[in-house]
Amino acid sequence: FIGRQGRNRRLFSVKDIKPRTEEFLKEYPVVLSTTYTAKNCIDKNWVFDYVIMDEASQVDITTGALALSCAMNAVIVGDDKQLPNVIDERTKTALKAIESAYRIDEKYRSTTHSFLQSCCEVFTDAPQTLLREHYRCHPKIIEFCNHLFYNGELVPMTQDKGEENVVTVIQTVKGQHARGHYNQREIDVIQSEVLPNLTNNGSVGIITPYRNQAEAINRQLGTKIASTVHKYQGRECDNIIMSMVDNTISEFSDDPNLLNVAIS
């Protein structure tokens, strides 16, 4: 909870919040919450003036709708070119049955749309603002994403200081080394050739499209340095090693949203 500054603030216990919502919000007008709990953290007869939802591309439609139901106005923030929410197969099967039985319009379907995508298609007249400035990656890295995914609309705010080898591609020797979303040859090359060159260059993270590969890397290196792209979204390191696993194009590893998040 974020309170008003410049005076002594009243204190509330957790049990006070629902029965004393009006008093509480006057003292603490900004409430931080997950999308799941936004509706239940205040009295059911009370609504916020605004709900601001961040990372809306990772929110499913049902949960997003619940969050909207507790506010008069909404600001939806997200990037539909990043990874959407993940639905497990059991839930997806159940949702498809419901969508088919009730002939749900495509733009409201949780199996094909994130909350952000649905809002963009439903509220076509709502004003949209592109946050163009990019502060994370080296210009040579973000320009790849900018050209491939954002139609050149991003403005890199980082500086190119003439660093060498900002982006390096290492192609492993061909062979039967990629099985079951796991590539031992890549792991060996990362351990013997890539990591030794990064020991004095800041923090290092390893990302991969597949959980099997991440687990195998961590076992071999004896540390939790690797993770899937989905779990790594939003994090950053000075150096990122991307282990693609597949030696041929696959639907999963060539997914544009996954590649955008992984590279940036």
PLM regions and their residue ranges:
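Conserved helicase NTPase catalytic core signature
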Residues: 1-47
